[in-house]
């Protein structure tokens, strides 16, 4: 009797092991089915970089418009946004959740160099296309990543062009830079130095700051004592606010010049208490009140579909960064696959909507080096200083 009980227990145990072995972790969906295509984006909806969070919400407007118009080849876009608080560790967590639980087909946007670098290799390893990172680190595209397609002009290119404008148009020779101590700021620093070298000039001050710093008194004093006539800012919105307010308190009034990352004038004007007036920035797209037919279309759609959102640079940047994936999906047709989308993306040439012209090939995934230059006028108005301008020193185009 005891032998039979032991045999029964053994049989049950073996059966249980076999059952567990057959219940392998479910593979994530392929990213699409007959009715939908799943696309994701991370972005800071909270935290020090929250003003940049509207980028991800702007992409949602684009996909809402696409779905309203019938979708793409019979499929609608199902879009997922996750808040990573501009924290690379959080980015890793939310991206893995989207890939492994939701089954994302592709990512668009994604604010920040450090957050993007934290997931770049993971996305490539999982063969997931990533279009239009909302960052411009040269390490995103050099060496080439077959799954990553950049829309944003490199920080190095932008800083190069802005420095040229300072020297040649503003006729200023004493230039300083306050930069975030990560890839975002360091790439810009390289671009500034590269351009200054052509004039046999050097920076009078180069000051790194950490993304989480809240006191810039010593840094501002160093800038003031350097005699800088113009200061480039490659920092996050919170740091920019603190810098300008601290500078105003000590009577330091250089010509501030900043990245397109701080080109949402109504926002920056408001949070600086009006101190943003007169600041010059790069711009990756047209002014928000542009009469460009597509800008008018999306601006009207925003009023109708997302009245709670403020139409501005960061918000429409989400459209600009995500639009190429829509174009590629249209080209592919009904027979959707990752390989087909990659082929379509690699064939995009001189494609332009509300931003610069984009061209990608199998050997080059940096889409552009062009930007506009604008100035914040009274009451946060936009003053166009320079149309599309490319970096004549860009080395990536020569490869």
Predicted regions, residues:
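Solvent-exposed, acidic/polar segments of extracytosolic/periplasmic ligand-binding ectodomains
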Residues: 26, 35-37, 293, 346-399
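Short, charged, surface-exposed loops that flank catalytic or proteolytic processing sites
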Residues: 330-343
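Beta-alpha junction/loop-to-helix N-cap segments that form part of ligand/metal-binding clefts
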Residues: 27-28, 36, 51-57, 69-142, ...
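Extracellular/periplasmic periplasmic-binding protein-like sensory domains
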Residues: 244-319, 389-396
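Immediate post-signal peptide segment of exported/extracytoplasmic ligand-binding proteins
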Residues: 26-41, 71-77, 167-173, 335
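Extracytoplasmic ligand/sensor domains, especially the bilobed periplasmic-binding protein
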Residues: 89, 103-206, 255-281, 287
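Extracytoplasmic "Venus flytrap"
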Residues: 29-35, 40-60, 82-89, 111-112, ...
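Short, low-complexity disordered leader/linker segments with a strong preference
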Residues: 1-38, 395-399
């Amino acid at each position: 009797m005891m032998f039979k009980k032991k045999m029964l227990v053994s049989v049950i145990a073996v059966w249980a092991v076999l059952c567990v072995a057959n219940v392998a972790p479910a593979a994530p969906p392929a990213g699409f089915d007959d009715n939908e295509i799943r696309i994701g984006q991370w972005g800071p909806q909270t935290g020090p970089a929250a003003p940049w969070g509207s980028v991800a919400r702007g992409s949602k407007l684009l996909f809402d418009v696409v779905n309203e118009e019938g979708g793409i080849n019979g499929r609608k876009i199902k879009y997922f946004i996750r808040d990573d608080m501009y924290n690379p560790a959080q980015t890793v967590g939310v991206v893995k959740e989207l890939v492994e639980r939701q089954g994302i087909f592709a990512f668009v946007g994604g604010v920040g160099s450090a957050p993007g670098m934290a997931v770049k290799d993971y996305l490539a390893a999982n063969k997931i296309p990533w279009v239009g990172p909302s960052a411009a680190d040269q390490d995103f595209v050099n060496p080439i990543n077959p799954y990553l397609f950049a829309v944003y002009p490199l920080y190095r290119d932008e800083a190069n062009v802005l420095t040229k404008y300072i020297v040649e148009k503003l006729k200023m020779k004493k230039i300083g830079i306050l930069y975030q101590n990560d890839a975002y700021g360091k790439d810009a620093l390289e671009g500034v130095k590269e351009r200054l070298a052509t004039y046999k000039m050097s920076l009078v001050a180069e000051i790194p700051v950490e993304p989480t710093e809240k006191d810039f008194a010593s840094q501002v004093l160093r800038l003031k004592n350097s005699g800088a006539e113009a200061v480039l800012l490659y920092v996050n919105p919170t740091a920019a606010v603190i810098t300008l307010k601290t500078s105003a308190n000590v009577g330091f009034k250089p010509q501030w010049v900043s990245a397109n990352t701080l080109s949402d004038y109504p926002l920056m004007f408001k949070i600086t208490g009006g101190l943003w007036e007169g600041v010059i920035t790069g711009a990756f797209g047209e002014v928000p009140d542009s009469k460009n037919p597509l800008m008018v279309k999306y601006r009207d759609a925003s009023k109708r579909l997302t009245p709670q959102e403020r139409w501005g640079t960061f918000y429409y940047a989400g459209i600009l960064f995500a639009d190429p994936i829509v174009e590629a999906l249209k080209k592919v047709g009904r027979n959707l696959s990752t390989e087909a989308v990659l082929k379509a993306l690699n064939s995009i040439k001189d494609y332009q909507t509300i931003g610069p012209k984009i061209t990608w090939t199998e050997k080059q995934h940096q889409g552009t080096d062009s930007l506009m230059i604008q100035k914040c006028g009274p009451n946060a108005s936009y003053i166009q200083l320079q149309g599309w301008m490319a970096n004549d020193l860009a080395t990536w185009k020569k490869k």
